[in-house]
Amino acid sequence: MRNLPAQIARSANAASSLSDGAAEIAPILSDRTVVRLDEESAASKQAKWQTVAIEAAKQCGQNWLPRVHVPQTMAQFFQQPRRFDLQLIGSLQSDAVHLKKILAEYSAEHGDRPTSVLMLVGPEGDFTPAELSLARSHGCRPITLGPIVLRVETASIYCLSVLSYELLV
């Protein structure tokens, strides 16, 4: 599988996400995140997840090495400069649009598919309104993953699968 530059924020299943094409994983410590990590624990988790990412890349025969970031808050995440063709955030809010519709709108507007996608997937129960507002202020469009609320692991894999299917030729 080619490198799909999609960055999944908050995925507990790095191997599955990376084998589905994520170039990077940036775990987000949202207000509704159950597990709280101190700096030492966060660094330890990051090292463990990076090892899993390397093993997943080897298993999948990828010719690029995915990167796993240290867990951070959403505010910290957006302080770092990033550039994506399309920025999305999973949301349970009523104005969220289906992922396939947003991809179709992007292609119609730009005459091509996006080559880099930021996909933020939140904790069960969704991001807080303040976190959604922050993401929107940084250009993220809210998407729905359907009528069923998915676990984080399932939502991440779902998003990567749809992006892979829709964007890779």
Predicted regions and their residues:
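Structured adenosyl-cofactor binding patch, chiefly the S-adenosyl-L-methionine
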Residues: 129-169
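Active-site/ligand-binding-proximal alpha/beta "capping" segment
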Residues: 82-132, 141-144
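A short acidic, often aromatic-flanked loop/helix-cap motif at beta-alpha or helix-coil junctions
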Residues: 72-78, 95-97, 150
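Short, solvent-exposed amphipathic alpha-helical segments in soluble enzyme
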Residues: 4-9, 17-20, 104-110, 134-138
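RNA substrate-binding interface of SAM-dependent RNA methyltransferases
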Residues: 1-89
